[in-house]
A protein has these predicted regions:
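Conserved acidic segment of CheY-like receiver
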Residues: 2-12, 18-19, 50
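Two-component/phosphorelay signaling modules centered on CheY-like receiver
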Residues: 12-30
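C-terminal output helix
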Residues: 107-116
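Acidic, metal-coordinating helix/loop segments flanking the phosphotransfer/catalytic sites
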Residues: 32-49
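Active-site residues of response regulator receiver
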Residues: 53, 83
Length: 121
């Protein structure tokens, strides 16, 4: 059975690029914000990996990560954070809070694919 990736990013172009490169090997569920992603998760869906942007409307990605890691239902799902911020302190903080990886935007799609494969296969 194909693995499922939940992608949360308010930029539709990121979703399209990720779907092109990851969609051949994985099922992708996309939401433009964390609120809709949480609603989907609370319907009983369990992805094998979550990829989330940090800067989003409604609920920031770091708040989304914190919610996931504090919730028994979701705490074991690996999360990759995406950001255009090159802040070392932010990367360290998010990794300490439970993110398994932090990828800077713009990213190389092949690099994303390799990082995803290392985490969920």
């Amino acid at each position: 059975m194909r693995k499922l990736i939940l992608l949360v990013d308010d930029k539709e172009t990121i979703a399209k690029v990720a779907s092109i490169y990851l969609g051949k090997d994985y099922d992708i569920q996309y939401f433009p914000d964390s609120i809709h992603a949480l609603e989907w998760l609370h319907e009983g869906k369990t992805p094998d990996l979550i990829i989330s942007d940090i800067r989003m409307p409604l609920m920031r990605g770091d708040e989304f990560l914190h919610y996931l890691k504090c919730n028994e239902l979701f705490k074991d799902i690996p999360v990759i954070m995406l950001s255009s911020e090159e802040s070392t302190s932010e990367r360290i903080r998010l990794l300490q809070e439970g993110a398994v990886d932090y990828i800077l935007k713009p990213f190389n799609p092949m690099e994303l694919k390799i990082r995803v494969k290392k985490i969920i296969e």
